């Protein structure tokens, strides 16, 4: 039985003619079959054409603290492009949505680590270095992908996917002092959150989604809307536009209220957490130094904007609206820092600018209650890219400029983004509380 029979129970969906419903039911099975086959063939083609360097996908360096311990992960890279295998795929043209389950197999991230202890640095200045290898076993991606119509083709835009590994194994390798003996220590956990992988998990998921998008977009764009739907393609375009208008109208209303709340709270500019890093001198000097930054700032939350059209999905139980926001102006820096190494003492300011960022927003309206219950399901930075860091006052320690950028990005990903997400979440929850969301969705 065609799944479209439930659409009569959908509260907010625009009516579809019987002709379009019949056409959707007729073309969907073949579309799904062709898309799965073309997707796998595109994966084989990319694998055959890719050079070795194209299979490595670099990740940003990581800086984080555990108690008094400061840990850096450097030169991180996903060691191969995943072999995406579709376990299931279903298309819902009435909602312009793909439902997918994709097997990515085992993924491996490798890099170097350096561990220091801030307290010991004053009494017993030691540093521990080595290699780290994190393996994500049997990773599965499940969820929905939003489609839009562009000219005579479909394009995929929003990925509401959950990546779940069966196990996560962290392997640390290092050599004993004055010895060629290699030591290996390993731990395994079922959840990413219980391992060091959490520090780069968001960026890794963004990398995986981008790789998936390239492969999927390359094949779905080949499907002709006119050939699939014939005379009914005009009605489908109109319907798709109505879904976009509903989603955008709700998001824009909540966004306007949330931004007003941010401004009224004086939260356009937030305080950034202190930055404290222990570092080694340039070879051959192995003496340690210390850099500490204070009076940090993050701005400007009042520049939150909708990046593009949002996706709208509805079934008999709920409505889901999802897509991406960004901060048009995103600055993060410190008015003052102090650094010391051997006899050199330096100080100045650190100013960072993030030119590209995406914040995934997902709203749900449950229809299982007497009144529609609106909830903020997700607010999460998906990507931060094109980052510029300018450091003043380094003087004789000018060779540290690249390191400072690395530390800034590490602190940004592991501490600053969490602060921003919490503030945005609070503002949207306030907006939802005082807004009649169902009324906005009803024409």
Could you describe each region identified by the protein language model?
Residues 2-157, 161-164, 213, 217-375, ...:
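Tubular lipid-binding modules of the TULIP superfamily
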Residues 149-223, 366-437:
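Extended amphipathic ligand-handling, pore-lining, and cofactor/metal-binding catalytic surfaces
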